[in-house]
Amino acid sequence: FINFFDGFRTSHEIQKIEIWDYEDLKPLVDMDAVKAFRKNALNPDAPVTRGTAENPDVYFQHREASNKFYLNVPDVVEHYMNEVNKLAGTNYQLFNYHGAPDATDVVVTMGSSAQVVESTVDYLNKLGRKVGFINVHLFRPFATDRLLKALPKTVERIAVLDRTKEPGALAEPLFLDVQAAVVDGGRNVKVIAGRYGLSSKDVIPADIVAVFDNLAADNGKKFFTLGINDDVTFLSLDRAEGVEVETPGLTECKFWGFGSDGTVGANKSAIKIIGDHTDMYAQAYF
């Protein structure tokens, strides 16, 4: 498995996190299996020669023989997500749905955009709009049955947000998987594709409202971008106006300063004091 983060964002951020106690983690880990795995590692103390080539008469068969292991991965991940949920009181699923139970318009995304989409969905639900979003927690292997199970039966339109660009391809990976899953499941649903966040370009609630507006429009863009002004291929969506997404108990501050005037240092000290000496959650981005 690969867990990946935005390197620039995480290197310019201070955030308060909750840490698990190792005693709580122990029941989730089969240490005998870990030891057996490590014994197979290549190292000078246990040298071994392994086949460096495989003839074409058997290579294809061996590649296909591994299918069952990949097919079992969703069940294994789901099992351990449920174990984590029991210990931490969380609700991790392979595909988490959030929003109106009878939503007609849904955004599917994963990673850094998930929280802003969730807060925007709550904002639009309060305004009476039947919208929702699906947060993808397991991208590979892609569990089509779990996605279709998470998707409300009332959904008519889906917007998929990818944080990557695949020049020359028909579209980006998550969009292609979601579209194939919807077709495979026999669902008559419109699916469109958006790109966001390249080089940490910000996406705000006004962008997500624009996604839902574009999704519901009769002449909306099938392929679009967020957070930029594309005056070359004209794929970008204009940010919606008048969007005020409020989170109860949240205080936000923005500071301006000149280089070396101490603004960054003072804010780093302040956010660390708040995080270390209060029960409040604290986050800072520089």
Predicted region positions:
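Glycine-rich, anion-gripping cofactor-binding loops and their flanking helix/strand elements
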Residues: 104-106, 114, 118, 123-126, ...
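Glycine-/acidic-rich phosphate or pyrophosphate-binding loops and their flanking alpha/beta elements
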Residues: 82-105, 118, 236-252
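Short acidic, glycine/serine/threonine-rich loops at helix termini
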Residues: 12-19, 118-120, 144-146, 169-173, ...
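Glycine-rich beta-alpha junction loops
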Residues: 5-12, 111-113, 164-165, 195-200, ...
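Conformationally flexible catalytic loops at phosphate/diphosphate-handling active centers
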Residues: 2-96
